Amino acid sequence: MATVRKGQWSGHLSREAFGERFRANFLDPAFEAEQASIARLEQVAWNAYRHGRKAPRTRGAGPGFDDPEYALSVEWSETRLRLLKAEAKQKNPGTRSRVLVICCAARNDGTCPGEMSKTFRLASLVRETLGKEEEVDIDLLDLSELASGYGRKIHPCKGCVSTAMPLCHWPCSCYPNHALGQTNDWMAEIYERWVAAHGIVLCTPVYWYQMPSPLKLMCDRLVCADGGNPDPTSTSGKDPEKAKALEQRGWGYPKHLQGRVYGLVVHGDVAGIEGTRRALSDWLDWMGLIDSGAASRLDRYIGYYEPYATSHEALDADAALHEEVRNVARAVANAVELLRAGNLSRPDVVLRSPRPK
């Protein structure tokens, strides 16, 4: 039996330190008239923190779970039901095809940068091209809302999978955590949008030789789609010993998003595009998604070693890049059509990995 290792966590905050962090949300002088009310709310929040009220609203799991009496988070249960509904629709051959286009840049004109991103323009080209397909619905997910939208958050992955795969639940049950104030987690909605799609197109810039933080946050939180446990009651929530025992007895590592097709548009200005494109394609391949052909995996420089200030003008002038981006969209549309008709070639689909993980 594997041993659960302890000793890293520094422990709970003091009452004073907790209060400082809580009150930091109310530094605007406009809140001064409500200091007494804020103090009462602080005490409620402190009690929730001290007593670990992660999921204050629960209900019995019910039939179909390993422990039907286990008190599951109502919020998690509702997310799960939405995913099951989206999956049923996605697998129904009578429904319209759906492609999720994701703008992965952090920049937009609604906050500090003051200008839209080139990535958004490229994602819009993808959306425009897909829009010409009669049987395709397009869903545009703009991750820059993390930087400009009130309360938008993708909390970081806590790494449960490294303790044991069954401790990582599908969908993620780490959030919301009301005791720690870790709420408004966007991933509950994002999981549903991935599940609903037949095709995915990621459009991303390169930040410091790699993907932007909004995209990395989403990638990490999608680990539960690759081997995640759909039954939190089997591990009594977050019991690491039970999860380790369950994995050691044999775990199937279910790929909850496998079989969808994908395309990539990666752009940069001086370096890093090939490594970023490779990292993303390897990640999607690992999760069981299918690339839409060589033309669907694009990496290009825009305004190579030119000033940042004129990079939009450089994009304006690169007509060939515009057409290459359109070809990514066309390749994905073609792949979705072939996939849903059962005609997409997948020579390795019957193979089983000798090293499942």
Q: Model-flagged regions — what are they?
A:
Residues 97-109, 263-266:
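Short beta-strand segments enriched in small/hydrophobic residues
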Residues 146-190:
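Cysteine-cluster motifs in flexible loop/terminal segments that predominantly coordinate metals
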Residues 95-104, 115, 126-128:
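Short, contiguous, helix-prone interaction/anchoring segments in small proteins
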Residues 2-98, 120, 271-274, 278-357:
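Glycine-rich phosphate/pyrophosphate-binding loop and the adjoining helix
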Residues 3-52, 75-88, 173-287:
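Helix-loop-strand module that forms the ligand-binding subsite of alpha/beta enzymes
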Residues 134-147:
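A short beta-strand-loop structural module common to alpha/beta enzyme folds
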Residues 122-135:
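A short, Lys/Arg-enriched amphipathic alpha-helix followed by its capping loop at the start of a domain
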Residues 108-122, 273-274:
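Glycine- and acidic-residue-enriched helix-capping/strand-helix junction motifs
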